[in-house]
Amino acid sequence: MLDILLFVHITISILLIIVILMQRSGSGGISGISGDNNMGVVSAKTVGNFLSKSTIILTTLFLINAIILANLSSKKKSNLVSKINEIEENQTDNSLPIAK
C-alpha cells in the first residue's frame, strides 16, 4: 500500500511540475515554445483556465497524498519500535548463560 501511494505521489509531482511550467508567465513560459500565437479553436484564455484548474486539482491531490503517506509511515514506524521492544524483552527473559 505504501509503495503504491509513493508511486502515485511521484507521478503527481511530475505532472504538477509539467503543468506549472506550461502556464503562461510574464516571459511566456513553455507554452510559448511553438511560436504560434494563433491557437485555432482553443483560445489562450481557455488553455489558461484549464492549466489553472489542473494546478489546483494536482496540488490538492499532492497534499492529501502527502498527509496519507505521513500517517501511514508514522504508524509503520511505531509498529516497528513496539516489535523491537518485544524482542528485547523476550531475549532478556529467556537468556541463559552460554557455558558454565
Curated annotation (Swiss-Prot):
Keywords: Cell membrane, Membrane, Protein transport, Translocation, Transmembrane, Transmembrane helix, Transport. GO terms for molecular function: protein-transporting ATPase activity. It is found in: Cell membrane. One of its GO terms (cellular component) is plasma membrane. It comes from the Bacteria. The keyword Nucleotidyltransferase does not apply. It is a multi-pass membrane protein. One of its GO terms (biological process) is intracellular protein transmembrane transport. The chain crosses the membrane at residues 1-21, 54-74. InterPro entries: SecG (IPR004692). Pfam families: SecG. Its main location: membrane. Belongs to the SecG family. Involved in protein export. Participates in an early event of protein translocation. This is Protein-export membrane protein SecG. It comes from Rickettsia typhi (strain ATCC VR-144 / Wilmington).
